[in-house]
């Protein structure tokens, strides 16, 4: 149901992803995240192509956190920011964070391997149905993603949508 992976470059960290649909308490979840009651990134799954996209954003966020170069105030807000193709923080939150009207949420947790993670505590806070993280692509709004990341038809023919999105995320700081 959830996906847990170690970060290759930061062996001491593990990333856990959870996906929920039919969520009825998005407003409360967002408030809990803002207040620090949920230590995780709450992401709108319609803007996610694949769990790998989240892993890339998380890896970059952990890297920037470790070297003290984050552009946002927390590791979890940095994950949301890293999903965006632009450097506008508020725009990233609007597009990739959850809103009060959302009925699905993708939760990303980053934890030290030595820490015990109480996933059941997080799950109990969500009034919705947990589904397998692999199903995130079924929630993807492909048209919205192509427009936001400015993916051309030519690019679409020679590679996957995930490739194009991850490339845009990777070069955001370079371009």
Swiss-Prot record:
Matches recorded under InterPro entries:
CGI121/TPRKB, CGI121/TPRKB_sf
Q: Which cysteines are joined by disulfide bonds?
A: none
Q: Name the Gene3D superfamilies on file.
A: CGI121/TPRKB (3.30.2380.10)
Knocked-out gene: effects: Embryos display primary microcephaly, leading to early lethality. Marked apoptosis is observed in the brain (telencephalon). Fishes do not show a renal phenotype, possibly as a result of early lethality.
Instruction: Indicate yes or no for the key word Thylakoid.
Output: no
> What keywords would UniProt list here?
Cytoplasm, Nucleus, tRNA processing
Annotated GO biological process: tRNA threonylcarbamoyladenosine modification
* Any GO CC annotation of this UniProt entry: cytosol
Q: Where, per UniProt, does this protein localize?
A: Cytoplasm, Cytosol; Nucleus
The job of this chain, per UniProt, is described as: Component of the EKC/KEOPS complex that is required for the formation of a threonylcarbamoyl group on adenosine at position 37 (t(6)A37) in tRNAs that read codons beginning with adenine. The complex is probably involved in the transfer of the threonylcarbamoyl moiety of threonylcarbamoyl-AMP (TC-AMP) to the N6 group of A37. Tprkb acts as an allosteric effector that regulates the t(6)A activity of the complex.
Q: Which family does it belong to?
A: Belongs to the CGI121/TPRKB family.
How it assembles, according to the record, is: Component of the EKC/KEOPS complex.
Name the UniProt record assigns to this protein: EKC/KEOPS complex subunit TPRKB
* Organism per entry: Danio rerio (Zebrafish)
């Amino acid at each position: 149901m959830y996906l847990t992976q170690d970060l290759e470059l930061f062996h001491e960290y593990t990333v856990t992803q959870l996906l929920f649909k039919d969520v009825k308490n998005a407003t409360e979840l967002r408030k809990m995240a803002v207040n620090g009651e949920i230590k995780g990134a709450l992401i709108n799954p319609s803007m996610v192509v694949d769990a790998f996209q989240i892993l890339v954003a998380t890896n970059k966020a952990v890297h920037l956190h470790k070297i003290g170069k984050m552009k946002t105030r927390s590791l979890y807000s940095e994950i949301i920011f890293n999903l965006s193709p632009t450097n506008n923080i508020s725009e990233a939150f609007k597009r990739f964070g959850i809103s009060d009207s959302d009925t699905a949420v993708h939760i990303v947790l980053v934890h030290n391997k030595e820490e015990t993670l109480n996933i059941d505590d997080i799950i109990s806070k969500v009034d919705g149905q947990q589904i397998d993280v692999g199903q995130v692509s079924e929630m993807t709004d492909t048209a919205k993603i192509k427009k936001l990341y400015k993916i051309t038809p030519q690019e679409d023919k020679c590679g996957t949508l995930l490739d194009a999105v991850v490339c845009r995320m990777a070069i955001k700081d370079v371009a």
